[in-house]
């Protein structure tokens, strides 16, 4: 029996990025392929006709490319960390129905997926935890989840499309707490400047009647802005769209490569990498 999801529910918010990853896989198979997303779409009882109609537009297809590159970039960072920390904890912050942990599984790492309880309930039904894996129902800002993570072999945290919905002080508090709790760990996530965040969250902000867009997390110069948060942070970043792949692929339109340059440049779309120092810089 298929898992039924009603429209205009919290569960529906999980379907949107899932459908995006499915379309990424179909349109750009040489760049990104999410077998789990493709399978889950077939197992969910939901009217995807509106999504299917929108998917024909050029800008929507560029949106799918954005999704593909974000997931591919973050997976690249996870795999890189696992090369030097094969027994590390791989932690998906705000996981939804994303299976990046599975895609990067090296056979020895430990996988953790964290999200709100109602989200984890859906995940448990559709993506039950496997071997060396744990689904944790918790608000990310409630740091009690720290105690659930076995970081004895290292800790690699990643968040895809999550921090745009956080206030800047919330991101700062969480990052600083993680740097203290997981020395030698690493956090990677996507970010963009204020103009881009306003465009991305336009509908959400309107529906939530939020007027102070400037309070939400945005980054222009990651190294300068985030290094000031803590002496334990080593900050670097790479372009979100072209920093890991030049997109010279037969499936990618030249116009999309142009838009990618605009995104990485004018919008400061980036993958931010925060390495947590093993010791406080002032002590080194």
PLM feature spans:
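Rossmann-like AdoMet
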Residues: 1-91, 95-138, 151-152
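Short amphipathic alpha-helix with an adjacent loop that forms part of the alpha/beta core around
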Residues: 143-153
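A conserved beta-strand element that flanks and buttresses the S-adenosyl-L-methionine
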Residues: 157-158
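A short, conserved alpha-helix within the catalytic core of class I
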Residues: 165-178
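Conserved beta-strand signature within the Rossmann-like core of class I S-adenosyl-L-methionine
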Residues: 181-194
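Short, glycine-/aromatic-enriched active-site segment of Class I SAM-dependent methyltransferases
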Residues: 198-213
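Short alpha-helix
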Residues: 213-240
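Conserved catalytic loop of SAM-dependent methyltransferase domains
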Residues: 232-258
């Amino acid at each position: 029996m298929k898992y039924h999801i009603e429209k205009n529910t919290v569960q529906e918010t999980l379907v949107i990025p899932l459908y995006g990853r499915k379309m990424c896989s179909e349109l750009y198979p040489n760049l990104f392929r999410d077998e789990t997303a493709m399978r889950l779409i077939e197992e969910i009882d939901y009217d995807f006709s509106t999504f299917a109609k929108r998917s024909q537009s050029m800008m929507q297809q560029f949106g799918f490319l954005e999704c593909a590159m974000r997931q591919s970039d973050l997976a690249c960072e996870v795999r890189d960390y696992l090369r030097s920390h094969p027994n590390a904890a791989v932690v998906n912050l705000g996981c939804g129905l994303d299976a990046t942990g599975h895609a990067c599984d090296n056979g020895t790492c430990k996988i953790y997926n964290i999200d709100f309880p109602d989200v984890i309930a859906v995940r448990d039904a559709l993506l039950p935890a496997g071997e060396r894996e744990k689904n944790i129902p918790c608000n990310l800002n409630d740091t009690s989840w720290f105690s659930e993570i076995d970081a004895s072999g290292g800790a690699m945290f990643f968040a895809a499309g999550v921090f745009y919905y956080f206030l800047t002080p919330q991101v700062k508090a969480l990052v600083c707490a993680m740097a203290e709790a997981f020395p030698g760990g690493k956090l990677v996530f996507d970010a963009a400047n204020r103009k881009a965040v306003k465009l991305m969250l336009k509908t959400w902000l309107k529906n939530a009647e939020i007027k102070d867009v400037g309070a939400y997390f945005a980054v222009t110069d990651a190294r300068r802005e985030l290094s000031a948060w803590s002496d334990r942070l080593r900050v670097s970043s790479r372009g979100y769209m072209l920093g890991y792949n030049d997109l010279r692929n037969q499936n990618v339109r030249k116009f999309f490569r142009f838009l990618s340059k605009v995104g990485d440049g004018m919008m400061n779309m980036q993958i931010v990498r925060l390495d947590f120092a093993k010791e406080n810089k002032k002590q080194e």
